[in-house]
Amino acid sequence: MTDTNWKQNLNLPPKDTRPQTEDVLNTKGKSFEDFNLKRELLMGIFEAGFEKPSPIQEESIPMALAGRDILARAKNGTGKTASFIIPCLQLVKPKLNKVQALILVPTRELALQTSQVVRTLGKHVGTQCMVTTGGTSLRDDIVRLHDPVHILVGTPGRVLDLAARKVVDLSECPLFVMDEADKMLSREFKGIIEQILEFFPPNRQALLFSATFPLAVKSFMDKHLTKPYEINLMDELTLKGISQFYAFVEEKQKLHCLNTLFSKLQINQSIIFCNSTNRVELLAKKITELGYSCYYSHAKMPQQARNKVFHEFRQGKVRNLVCSDLLTRGIDIQAVNVVINFDFPKTAETYLHRIGRSGRFGHLGLAINLMSWNDRYSLYKIEQELGTEIKPIPATIDKSLYVAENADAVPRPFRIDELPKGNETVHNKGYQYKGQPVKDENSGSSSQQQQQPPPQQQQQQSTSPPQQQPQQQQQQPNPQHQFAPHPNGQFPPYPQQFHQPGAIPPQQFNGYPPYPQYPPQFAGYPGQPPQLPQGQQQHAQAQNPAQQY
């Protein structure tokens, strides 16, 4: 391949022509070719859809290639991940069969996402990347480390375990990278990070990236970094493309308000945050009962289920995701344009990372906060700390604030064309519009029982030409506060008090994929539990707190 035509043979993705903000456009006019990168690395960068470096990439990549320690601070969704992955891929030597770069991240989902970016950008370089996290088989990680691994991505606990067992050798690893450094240096991880650094050589290079840097980062920098190059692109903390609104809602009316938002907003994909795992599962159940496709994810779920939820949501197989603060950091899903705080966060840091899941890489996004009257103090505190204004929600929200003017401008990977645009739910055989029965392929009949119309209407229907379903959908009126139809064809009752979940979930709620079965202790449900002798009932109730509800 000659020097002139190598770009012509690239498999470039569709160009993203959505409008972008100054967060990623305020650059010095450099290109990736100005960094003297390998041609194989440039091929992976361009084929991944990158056109020009963002401000944080312009500042950090040259200094990282020069061997300097870096302490970089930039907004969420401005390209921090590529800022440290590109130098790693450039400095790694594929012919040297040893770990040459360690990337530490706080969550398992972020580790999976980071490893995927490494493989995407470095697919022509020839480097081998491995991801290791807690909740997975340690034996499998040990077996995989017998093969060549150049870049290791993982969470601190598992990496420390592998290093302490001398399964992975970090004594000659020249690169140490921490993403979300403020979280990594909190009390939860700081001791583990200190132990991991003891396995590194004294002349290793350290790259630290985050959106917020507390005092703990300053003390770590003074101890472990050598004349670090500090980058601070935070002229303001919040992204310029995100519109922020709040609404004071009583607790028992929050679900009704959420249903109204679903019917009014043009949502491509949305993330809904709750403050506890119990409320995450309960809210996902309520949203499913309203007729909307929904998954949920939190830290107490099995790792296999968390991975399945994360990948299917990234692929656009579901429109809404209810989660705890597990997915507040680093998760980059370009199709998400709406973030809803069903429970208002207590700290400015949590709020900043939550709303940063929308408006990725300078695009438009919308953040809506459902607040109780007691949250007004937290609202004032967050506004003061972030230096931003959260406005009261208007009667109608202008679509130009969070939706691209031209729908065709959104690249195919970021479009959810396979999902219905209105109210939908998940059936065993795929997505179906409300009112359309799910056809049974074996019997040829519908799974929903429909009433037969009178003979005169049947004759009129047989003589009239068939109409397409989208035209019928447009002819139906759309009242302002109309509920989403229930999967059984009926409308749900007015939302009741938002209470804690019972021991047994409703049978129509499938939960997160893979859909779990009833717990073993409730194997007899539905029905009555086995009767115990009177002397053992009190002891059994104490052993199973779930039956106290």
Swiss-Prot record:
Question: Which cell locations does it reside in?
Answer: Cytoplasm, P-body
Domain Helicase ATP-binding, by residue range, is 61-231
**Which residues belong to the signal peptide in this entry?**
none
Question: Which parts of the sequence form the motif Q motif?
Answer: 30-58
Q: Which reaction does it catalyse?
A: ATP + H2O = ADP + phosphate + H(+)
Q: Which Gene Ontology BP annotations are present? A: cellular response to glucose starvation; cellular response to nitrogen starvation; deadenylation-dependent decapping of nuclear-transcribed mRNA; invasive filamentous growth; mRNA processing; mRNA transport; negative regulation of translation; negative regulation of translational elongation
Polar residues biased stretches: 1-11
Keyword Hydrolase tagged:
yes
Disulfide bonds listed in the record: none
Q: Find motif (DEAD box) and give its ranges.
A: 179-182
Task: Please name the PROSITE patterns in this protein's record.
Answer: DEAD_ATP_HELICASE (PS00039), HELICASE_ATP_BIND_1 (PS51192), HELICASE_CTER (PS51194), Q_MOTIF (PS51195)
Enzyme class label: hydrolase
Q: What keywords is this UniProt entry annotated with?
A: ATP-binding, Cytoplasm, Helicase, Hydrolase, mRNA processing, mRNA transport, Nucleotide-binding, RNA-binding, Translation regulation, Transport
Q: Where is the Helicase C-terminal domain?
A: 241-401
**What residue spans carry the Basic and acidic residues bias annotation?**
414-427
Provide the E.C. number(s) assigned to this enzyme: 3.6.4.13
Superkingdom, taxonomy of origin: Eukaryota
Q: Name one GO molecular function term.
A: chromatin binding
Q: Which Gene Ontology cellular component terms are annotated? A: cytoplasmic side of membrane; cytoplasmic stress granule; P-body
Q: Where does ATP bind?
A: 74-81
Q: Where is the composition biased (Low complexity)?
A: 445-482, 496-512, 533-549
Q: What does this protein do?
A: ATP-dependent RNA helicase involved in mRNA turnover, and more specifically in mRNA decapping. Is involved in G1/S DNA-damage checkpoint recovery, probably through the regulation of the translational status of a subset of mRNAs. May also have a role in translation and mRNA nuclear export.
Please give the record's comment on domains: The Q motif is unique to and characteristic of the DEAD box family of RNA helicases and controls ATP binding and hydrolysis.
Entry's family note: Belongs to the DEAD box helicase family. DDX6/DHH1 subfamily.
- This one is known as ATP-dependent RNA helicase DHH1
User: Which source organism?
Assistant: Candida albicans (strain SC5314 / ATCC MYA-2876)
Encoding gene (name): DHH1
